[in-house]
Design a protein with these regions (language model features):
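Core dinuclear metal-dependent hydrolase active-site scaffold
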Residues: 2-6, 16-19, 95-124, 128-129, ...
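Rhodanese-like catalytic fold shared by cysteine-dependent sulfurtransferases
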Residues: 142-143, 155, 202-238, 242-244, ...
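Conserved beta-strand hairpin/beta-sheet module of binuclear metal-dependent hydrolase folds
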Residues: 1-46, 117-132, 137-138
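Active-site neighborhood of phospho(di)ester-bond hydrolases with catalytic His/Asp-centered motifs
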Residues: 26-27, 47-56, 74-79, 106-109, ...
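Metallo-beta-lactamase
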Residues: 101, 111-228
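Active-site metal-binding motif and surrounding structural segment of the metallo-beta-lactamase
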Residues: 33-75
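Divalent metal-coordination and catalytic microenvironments
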Residues: 18, 28, 54, 66, ...
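Active-site metal-binding loops of divalent metal-dependent hydrolases
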Residues: 29-30, 55, 79, 111, ...
Length: 470
């Protein structure tokens, strides 16, 4: 028997590859199937089952393409309703993979169909729990995402989650290894640890949600402080339920090279968003007017989903050479399949063709320090609220990037302001969106709060240990 965790850091997502006796199972695969196909060929095994822990909201799963290519059966937990062929398992149902077994544990709460998969090894021992979004390390699945489809309140769903965890998961043996669907950085929870596997025994001791005195306390704790989910979550659920275009077709279309003249014409005719995925430093130096920057070198896919409102938005890509396929792939993981092509030769080709360019006005933290001592200034901090609360510049306003589509309308076009994030990754995103919407009355601070913290600019007292995120 072999268990392999295939962890994708930029999505904070874990898929699982299990083999035994010439057969295999994959749990919660990502959109692109090639990594799994390669493993199956290398190991000389037949994929028998594709297990889904629930209808994912934060990414589009690869279950359909993988099933088409391997003839493996797709398995969901009880109550799931799909528009494609799938086994809708019963609670406690057993599936055999070679010499091992997987038992379905129906654990509603995060969603109604949410299920965990308990692995029973060749000796009959319960050894691993693939817990999906029911149980994370340090947290549990948020109970607010399925309110509409379940016709239940988040408190009612949280009550179901309590029953699932306390009656089905906690009685399991301490030595069982927990393999969750997500880790720190995912929007599917609020308090996840950076580790990607742990023993159930340790989680029983350390996970706040597993140590509540009663159901009421549990409901209060798990619903407190939940931020609104990204807009793309609902569409991803629908794609996972109903189906989607083949990833191979999406990739083929997205990898169409376009010379500057073609690129410009298609942008005008289609109304495509020009998405520049270069680093924030490269983008700030020069870019195509109206383009939006979300760098591949950060949490690319989640920010795409948070900032681009419509998953059906046509997209044209500007990339560094050789990063075209990576960009199309990562867009498809969150359901953005309408990539029309990429700028052949990148931004350099655009410049050489003599076409109009733009740039972001940036200054160093040292220059910023001089300027704030010379005049009264307005400062906008676009980090997450938790980062702002931990430590921030005196008099800075908190306006998180995730909500820029709401707060940018409150900006006075004639009032100048300075803007920063944690490192420069997010503030350049914000700068690109602001300039695309016609706002030019701001200055971005290079290096973000990390760099600012090295100056003598007055700051609030440090309140708690907070990871400064990109």
């Amino acid at each position: 028997m072999k268990i392999e965790q295939i962890y994708t850091g930029c999505l904070a997502q874990g898929a699982y590859y299990i083999t035994s006796g010439g057969e295999a199972a994959i749990i919660d695969p990502l959109r692109e199937t090639q990594p799994y196909i390669e493993r199956l060929k290398k190991d000389g095994v037949q994929l028998k089952y594709i297990f889904e822990t629930h209808f994912h909201a934060d990414f589009v799963s690869g279950h359909l393409d993988l099933s088409r290519k391997t003839n493996a059966s797709i398995v969901y937990g009880p109550t799931a309703q799909t528009e494609f062929d799938a086994i809708i398992a019963e609670d406690q149902q057993i599936f055999e993979i070679g010499d091992v077994k997987i038992k379905v544990l129906h654990t509603p709460g995060h969603t109604l169909e949410s299920s965990c998969y308990l692995l029973i090894d060749e000796s009959g021992n319960e050894t691993a729990l693939f817990s999906g979004d029911t149980l994370f390390l340090g947290d549990v699945g948020r109970p607010d995402l399925a309110q509409k489809s379940a016709d239940m309140t988040q408190n009612e769903l949280a009550g179901l989650l309590y029953e699932s965890l306390y009656h089905k998961i906690l009685p399991l043996a301490d030595e069982i290894t927990v393999y969750p669907a997500h880790g720190a950085g995912s929007a599917c929870g609020k308090n996840m640890q950076k580790e990607t596997l742990d023993t159930l025994g340790n989680q029983k001791k350390t996970n706040y949600a597993l140590n509540q005195k009663d159901k009421e306390s549990f409901i209060k704790e798990v619903t407190d402080g939940l931020l609104p989910p990204p807009a793309y979550f609902g569409m991803n659920v629908m794609m996972n339920k109903k189906g989607y275009d083949s990833f191979d077709e999406v990739l083929s279309q997205g990898l169409q090279p376009l010379v500057p003249e073609q690129f410009e014409e298609i942008a005008e005719v289609s109304g495509a968003l020009i998405l520049d995925v270069r680093s924030n430093g490269r983008f700030a130096e020069g870019f195509i007017p109206q383009s939006v920057n979300i760098g591949l070198d950060g949490d690319f896919a989640p920010w795409v989903g948070a900032l681009i409102v419509d998953v059906n938005q046509p997209i044209l890509l500007v990339t560094e050479k050789g990063e075209e396929e990576e960009a199309v792939t990562r867009l498809s993981r969150v359901g953005f399949d309408k990539v029309l092509g990429f700028l052949e030769g990148g931004f350099d080709a655009w410049k050489k063709s003599g076409k109009e360019t733009d740039a972001v006005h940036r200054i160093s933290p040292e220059q910023f320090e001089k300027e704030i001592h010379q005049k009264e200034v307005k400062i906008i901090d676009i980090r997450r609220e938790s980062e702002y609360n931990a430590e921030h510049i005196h008099e800075a306003y908190s306006k998180p990037l995730a909500y820029i589509n709401e707060w940018l309308h409150t900006i006075e076009p004639e009032e100048h302001f300075y803007m920063h994030c944690g490192s420069g990754y997010r503030s350049t995103m914000a700068a690109s969106i602001l300039q695309a919407r016609g706002y030019r009355n701001f200055t971005e601070i290079e290096g973000g709060f990390r760099a600012i913290s090295l100056t003598s600019i007055p700051k609030s007292d440090f309140v708690c240990q907070t990871k400064i995120l990109k």
